[in-house]
């Protein structure tokens, strides 16, 4: 089954897998588009849209180890919910938002391992 990707309004190169918005709302428990976490994500997506790979110099963007194909995360570490958004660069510098989750287990990294697996499967479904 191939996942659909949808271009996000207001961005040139940012796309999200179908269901991403609902997944994000569930993770941050926030339905208001002008809420704290929606505003944070929108700001970070503007940086990503404008800067591409240069965004990785921002401390809130990080490459993910052991991901294949290579993926990255946007983080909001000092927030109560500690959300993460996993994304990948694809053709022509487009960015696909693949998965969002709440990091709760820093010691074991199990949240990341599980989330990376979900994101890898979604990306493979899209590019196949």
Predicted regions located by residue number:
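Basic, Lys/Arg-enriched alpha-helical interface segments
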Residues: 1-82, 90-95, 102-128
């Amino acid at each position: 089954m191939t996942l659909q990707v949808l271009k996000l309004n207001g961005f040139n190169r940012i796309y999200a897998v179908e269901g991403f918005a609902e997944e994000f709302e569930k993770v941050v428990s926030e339905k208001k588009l002008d809420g704290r976490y929606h505003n944070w994500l929108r700001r970070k997506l503007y940086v990503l849209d404008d800067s591409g790979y240069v965004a990785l110099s921002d401390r809130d963007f990080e490459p993910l180890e052991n991901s294949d194909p290579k993926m990255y995360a946007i983080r909001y570490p000092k927030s109560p919910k500690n959300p993460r958004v996993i994304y990948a660069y694809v053709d022509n510098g487009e960015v696909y938002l693949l998965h969002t989750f709440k990091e709760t287990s820093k010691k074991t990294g199990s949240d990341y391992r599980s989330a990376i697996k979900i994101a890898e499967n979604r990306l493979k479904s899209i590019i196949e």
